[in-house]
Curated annotation (Swiss-Prot):
Organism of origin: Arabidopsis thaliana (Mouse-ear cress)
Recorded superkingdom: Eukaryota
InterPro entries given in the database record: Ntn_hydrolases_N (IPR029055), Proteasome_alpha (IPR050115), Proteasome_beta2 (IPR035206), Proteasome_bsu_CS (IPR016050), Proteasome_sua/b (IPR001353), Proteasome_suB-type (IPR023333)
Localization in the cell: Cytoplasm; Nucleus
KW Secreted (keyword) present: no
Tissue expression: Ubiquitous low levels, higher expression in siliques and flowers.
Name recorded for this polypeptide: Proteasome subunit beta type-2-B
Any matching Pfam family: Proteasome
Gene Ontology BP terms: proteasomal protein catabolic process
Annotated family: Belongs to the peptidase T1B family.
Modified residues annotated as N-acetylmethionine in this record: 1
Length: 199
């Protein structure tokens, strides 16, 4: 029952993800951060099989860091998204990863951006995107309330509406969510929306 969603506002991108580590009917953990920081101005929110998700996002993170180390300049968000898509496409015929990604970033020239990359290596630049069962409700909520000129406060309010909708509509809804923002000041954690604490 994973839920990952994000949107682009006026000079920033925001992503939110549930924090449940689930296998079949078992909940292993409810504080699993599924949003990885790629570098100072990029975030990757991922859903999918836990092993694939962790291994692939770490692989992308290390390769983005390696590129910056070798060349002295960071990859742009578009370049990082295209690299990620290429690696997924290469793996697709050999040992496919079951992982879906929303990549959010901020570049000086291009501004804030959000890229949708699914498990079969489809890549799209989007204003808003979502994966998982929660996407049915978060996408419809964002379709109704989203504006491209939203402030951070308005975007957080919209994210909270999406989380509320997911919690009220899904039979087995994820209880906790983490929210992260990337803008000209860098990538940072905004906060957690917790309804269940660890036992």
């Amino acid at each position: 029952m994973e839920c990952v969603f994000g949107l682009v506002g006026n000079g920033f991108a925001i992503v939110a993800a549930d924090t449940s580590a689930v296998h079949s009917i078992l909940l292993h953990k409810n504080k699993e951060d599924k949003i990885m920081t790629l570098d100072s101005h990029k975030l990757v929110a991922a859903s999918g099989e836990p092993g694939d998700r962790v291994q692939f996002t770490e692989y992308v993170q290390k390769n983005v860091s390696l590129y910056q180390f070798r060349n002295g300049i960071p990859l742009s968000t578009a370049a990082a998204a295209n690299f990620t898509r290429g690696e997924l496409a290469t793996a697709l015929r050999k040992n496919p990863y079951s992982v879906n990604i929303l990549m959010a970033g901020y570049d000086k020239e291009a501004g804030a951006s959000l890229y949708y990359i699914d498990y079969i290596a489809t890549l799209h630049k989007v204003d808003k995107g979502a994966f998982g069962y929660g996407s049915y409700f978060s996408l419809s909520t964002m379709d109704r309330h989203y504006r491209s000129d939203m402030s951070v406060e308005e975007a957080i309010e919209l994210v909270d509406k999406c989380i509320l909708e997911i919690r009220s509509r899904l039979v087995i809804a994820p209880p906790n969510f983490v929210i992260k923002i990337v803008d000209k000041d860098g990538a940072r954690e905004y906060g957690w929306r917790i309804s269940t604490a660890d036992a």
